[in-house]
Amino acid sequence: MSVKILSVAKQLPKHTRETKDIIPFVKLWMQGQETRFQRKVLKLFEGAGVDRRYSIMDAEEVFLNSSFEDKNNIYVREVTTLAEQSLKKSLEKASLQPTDIDYIITVSCTGIMIPSVDAYLINSLQMRQDIVRLPVTEMGCAAGVSGIIYAKNFLQANPNKRAAVIAVESPTATFQLEDFSMVNIVSAAIFGDGA
């Protein structure tokens, strides 16, 4: 049995700035670091090929020395909204209702939610209570593709069913101000938030 994607939609968060407007925040963050290291980091941000950055929080909040718990609370609130808006757009494009979905897969590796975002979507969109759920977490960049593969396998095993895959990420929620590792820096330089 063949499986096909009926629609794709995205939802970006409301906070956005051009990279040139983020550089002053990066310079402040880098104060106290070795000059050569600072130049390297600035070059990385400027050369990342990312002209506009989207975030679930304003740049001032991202670079604020707040706890992981505080940022994760913002993550929970905002990614639920992004995921819901993205799913609603995709369902509308496909002329489907939330109750038409038999299998929901949510993908995220940038925050911690229990229950996961799929449970919130089922309630907020009044999806069927017998829907099959699969939260895919901690898989990094391969998670979105994995979610699509899981959906394909489910649909091939269950003809005439429908699945929704929602990938939502917010690396700004996991940005650690005290962490000057290249992993944290590269993540901040190249990744953005959205669903």
Give the label of every model feature segment.
Residues 77, 84, 88-98, 110-195:
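Acyl-thioester C-C bond-transforming condensing/cleaving domain
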Residues 102-108:
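Short glycine-rich or small-residue beta-strand-to-loop segments that form or flank ligand, phosphate
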Residues 1-102:
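Conserved active-site "lid/cap" helical segment
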Residues 24-27, 41, 45, 59-64, ...:
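A sequence-level detector of short, solvent-exposed, charge-rich linear segments
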